Amino acid sequence: REMPPLGFPCVMTFSSVVRLADGSYLGLYHRGPGGRDRPPLEVLATRTADGGFTWSEPVVVAKLKGRNLCEPFCFRSPDGEELCCLMRENAHLDRSFIMFSRDEGTTWSEPVKTPWGLTGDRHMGVSAPDGRLVVAFRDKAKNSPTDGHFVAWVGSYDDIKAGRPGDYRIKLLHSHAGSDCGYPGMEVLPDGSILATTYIKYRPGADRHSVVCTRFSPAETDRLAEAAD
């Protein structure tokens, strides 16, 4: 049966849902005043203990004066003890931002800037079989040669925590419509390769956007990165 609306004014639905240690789920999303897509933007969190039928009253978990945090991507640390949340800075006045929680999302650290290489929009990532993180997003790093295109960052969780650049970034797909791409889906396939899916205008001409998948393995991109050095 169709459930009634939650009544949470927002720009878009949850951009991240993560399972908590007690089996409940934490949903994160962003909004502006009145739920509209205008500054100042803030990130909110809500919980469900019944599989999504009901949700708690949302609480603001991230906001910064002069910055517009949005599109949270939340994931768990390799040891399972910490939640990490990557956020877009919507005005592109700064790098992206990141915050951490060690109490299952009840409280969060103050948002801080990510490394330059993780600066962008619409982050989504997976853990590769070797334990490294592969995070895909629309590149918006200042002075980046791949600004506006679909890229992936490869590195460790410790790199993110310490503000290190990680192993490398790689351009996955070229956008022929400016920076109009992203909102990726990411899957690790049974053979260990990674499937990244995005909407993108992948070739010039009259054709408009398509939904495109690109498949790669960290071993393959490692070789490409080494060859580029």
Placement of each model-derived feature along the sequence:
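Asp-box/BNR beta-propeller blade signature and adjacent active/binding-site loops
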Residues: 1-229
